[in-house]
Amino acid sequence: MEKEGLAKSSDTSIKKEGFISQSLSKDGIPNQSLPDDHIGIENISVEPNKLYEAVSNLRNYGFNYLQCQGGYDEGPGKNLVSFYHFITVDDFQKIEKIKEVRLKVFLKRDSDLSIPSLYKIFKGSDWQERETYDMYGINFIDHPNPTRLLMPEDWRGWPLRKDYIQPDFYELQDAY
C-alpha cells in the first residue's frame, strides 16, 4: 500500500509494513514498506526531507552502525536511488542476533537531487556519500567536504548513470 507523497519505486509489489516501518509511522515519519530482500532484511522508502529524522529515530531504536551507503540508477527516465544499510552492533551480541534494516530514498531524475547528509549522525558516511555524489550526482546537503572522490574535479557527468554518454576522447598527460 503506497502512502501519499512518497516517490514510487519501480517495484510495484504490495508489502505489509514491517516492524521498523510501523515504528517510524508511530513516530510520525511517513514511509513506505518495500519487499524484503532475498535474506529477509526489511526495506523502507522515505522522502528526502524525512531522511535525517528517520535515521535519527533508527539510531534511537539501536541501529548504531551505518554498514553501507550507496546509490543506483533504475534506468533511463526512471529514479535515482540512495540507499542506507543499518545494523545493530553490541559488544556482547551474537552474530545471528544482529538486526538489519535498509532505507531507500527515490529521487526523480529530472527533479532536485539533494538529500540531507548523514555525516552529523554517522561520521562513516563521509566518503560513501562523496562516492555516490561522484558517480550519480546526488547532492548531500550539509556534507563537510562535497567534492568528487574518484573522478577529476572538472569531470562532466555522472559515470554510473545508465543515461551517461561516455566522452569520445581522453586527454593524455605527460608523465613528466
Curated annotation (Swiss-Prot):
Catalytic activity: a plastoquinone + NADH + (n+1) H(+)(in) = a plastoquinol + NAD(+) + n H(+)(out); a plastoquinone + NADPH + (n+1) H(+)(in) = a plastoquinol + NADP(+) + n H(+)(out)
Compartments it resides in: Cellular thylakoid membrane
A GO biological-process term: photosynthesis, light reaction
GO cellular component: plasma membrane-derived thylakoid membrane
EC number: 7.1.1.-
Source species, domain of life: Bacteria
Membrane topology qualifier: Peripheral membrane protein
Enzyme category, top tier: translocase
Main location: membrane
GO MF terms held by the record: NADH dehydrogenase (ubiquinone) activity; quinone binding
Pfam families tied to this protein: Complex1_30kDa
Record SUPFAM superfamilies: Nqo5-like
Keywords: Membrane, NAD, NADP, Plastoquinone, Quinone, Thylakoid, Translocase, Transport
Annotated segments matching region Disordered: 1-32
Free-text function comment from the UniProt entry: NDH-1 shuttles electrons from an unknown electron donor, via FMN and iron-sulfur (Fe-S) centers, to quinones in the respiratory and/or the photosynthetic chain. The immediate electron acceptor for the enzyme in this species is believed to be plastoquinone. Couples the redox reaction to proton translocation, and thus conserves the redox energy in a proton gradient. Cyanobacterial NDH-1 also plays a role in inorganic carbon-concentration.
NCBIfam families xrefs: PRK12494.1 (NF009141)
Assembly mode: NDH-1 can be composed of about 15 different subunits; different subcomplexes with different compositions have been identified which probably have different functions.
Family: Belongs to the complex I 30 kDa subunit family.
HAMAP family attached to this UniProt entry: NDH1_NuoC (MF_01357)
Name by which UniProt lists this protein: NAD(P)H-quinone oxidoreductase subunit J
Provenance organism: Prochlorococcus marinus (strain MIT 9215)
Gene from which this protein is expressed: ndhJ
